[in-house]
Amino acid sequence: MEKFMAEFGQGYVQTPFLSESNSVRYKISIAGSCPLSTAGPSYVKFQDNPVGSQTFSAGLHLRVFDPSTGALVDSKSYAFSTSNDTTSAAFVSFMNSLTNNRIVAILTSGKVNFPPEVVSWLRTAGTSAFPSDSILSRFDVSYAAFYTSSKRAIALEHVKLSNRKSTDDYQTILDVVFDSLEDVGATGFPRGTYESVEQFMSAVGGTNDEIARLPTSAAISKLSDYNLIPGDVLYLKAQLYADADLLALGTTNISIRFYNASNGYISSTQAEFTGQAGSWELKEDYVVVPENAVGFTIYAQRTAQAGQGGMRNLSFSEVSRNGGISKPAEFGVNGIRVNYICESASPPDIMVLPTQASSKTGKVFGQEFREV
């Protein structure tokens, strides 16, 4: 059967999907609904074709996929009451018993009640969009999400609220494209682990080289306070600054350091400012939480007692895998692998698809690409 893959126009390439996770093999599409929605009903599709029963009664529905083949392996439907009962307990038990290699599509259809233990499970799974109890009591919810059992976490979600009076498009459409389970959540999970938009500057000259210690001022912060455990992968990002006087003798340094239960140092990952004096330079890296780690700190400092250094816009979030690129750029039926997008381009080419050996595999230019 014919399927649109890409359109080449004057100065642009149009594809169905620009895959930030560098994946194009499988695509699951879902949509949730609620009463008074003017859009279509709930659905579940694989490779843009309906998969499994498309008849959804009022309630919360689960579709379980094997990510290695894309096969639908299980289906569940739950019509909850407003309070905890055997149905809500069955939902929690089923979700907690899943093997660690499943993708679960979660979607609503029609009027859905959400008893406390179901809401509690969603909170534990890392939802950031699901409404509070006070909103649930006044609005109907259209909800769609993808849950990855390997991380026991919601990887993507979409929610809309109906005031129970007005008709509107309440359909919550959500797509995920992946090659393997590790691709789901590769750009981060809804629960942002930590973010600071503050700007921190060191003293000018003097002997105090500290710029900032985060996420708290304590020498060691608990990993558990940020839902992190050994083996988790973090995407760490910050902007660093150094003036000319500092660069004449040193630079600005940032490190994330890990500690064991006895507060003993285990390991660290560091980055240094290498840009032009007086400018801000973005630094980003993937960091694996080491074995036996229970605490950590992020520390920014000058490496010389001269001039001024700075740090701003620090954030770190859990992702499903590190950022190593193991697959060459390519077109697939679900779009194009793209690892990162530049805002502008200087080459005359419509696009560049480097080889797997290239350090810039998957690089495309944002001004030349658009999604359908």
From Swiss-Prot:
GO annotation (BP), single: adhesion receptor-mediated virion attachment to host cell
Keywords recorded for this protein, A-Z: Host-virus interaction, Late protein, Lectin, Viral attachment to host adhesion receptor, Viral attachment to host cell, Viral tail fiber protein, Viral tail protein, Virion, Virus entry into host cell
GO CC term (a single one): virus tail, fiber
Annotated localization: Virion
GO molecular function, one term: carbohydrate binding
Keyword Nucleotide-binding included in the entry's annotation: no
Pfam families assigned: ILEI (PF15711)
Subunit: The long-tail fibers are trimeric, with a stoichiometry of gp34/gp37/gp36/gp35 of 3:3:3:1.
Protein name: Long-tail fiber protein gp35
Record organism: Enterobacteria phage T4 (Bacteriophage T4)
Gene assigned in the entry: 35
